[in-house]
């Protein structure tokens, strides 16, 4: 129940900032043809499969700013409720968030969204597999080009006519 609660809250916050749920963001933006698969942030030096199933990794700078602003206001509200010893149960927080978003003239998620979490993750992983294959091919081609350049550089350092050099050596 707790996991579902936080998932609902997260989706409501994403929707208020972007007009899409987390799953809808992933479904709409995971694209193997885009640079870094459409992600705007990821954990390591390059995009990994674990990064593509995280909705916030696709957010644009303005959306991140909006989401952060909403979350900070919401947490301040929740902290104020706690300090005043207002007893609010998890089931009530969902309604409180909807009220909070309306008061702040934000979009309120009317339902669970159009895309399931599983469908979004499946889509993102399939796109990642295509992206990863293309990235691997690009790296292999780059390595081959570097290898050819090294061979050409080494070839230029060789004597121009090795047979002529050999004859000079034989006469001595």
Predicted regions and their residues:
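Positively charged, phosphate-engaging catalytic surfaces used for nucleic-acid and nucleotide handling
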Residues: 1-172
């Amino acid at each position: 129940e707790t996991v579902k609660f936080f998932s609902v809250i997260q989706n409501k916050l994403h929707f208020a900032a972007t007009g899409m749920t987390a799953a809808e963001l992933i479904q709409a933006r995971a694209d193997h043809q885009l640079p870094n698969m459409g992600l705007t942030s990821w954990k390591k030096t390059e995009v990994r499969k674990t990064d593509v199933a995280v909705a916030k990794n696709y957010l644009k700078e303005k959306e991140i700013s909006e989401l952060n602003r909403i979350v900070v206001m919401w947490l301040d509200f929740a902290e104020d409720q706690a300090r005043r010893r207002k007893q609010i149960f998890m089931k009530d927080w969902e309604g409180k968030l909807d009220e909070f978003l309306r008061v702040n003239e934000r979009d309120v998620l009317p339902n669970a969204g159009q895309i399931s979490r599983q469908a979004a993750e499946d889509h993102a992983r399939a796109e990642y597999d295509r992206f990863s294959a293309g990235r691997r091919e690009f790296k292999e081609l780059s390595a081959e080009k570097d290898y050819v350049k090294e061979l050409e550089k080494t070839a230029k350092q060789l004597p121009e006519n090795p047979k002529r050099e050999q004859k000079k050596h034989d006469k001595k």
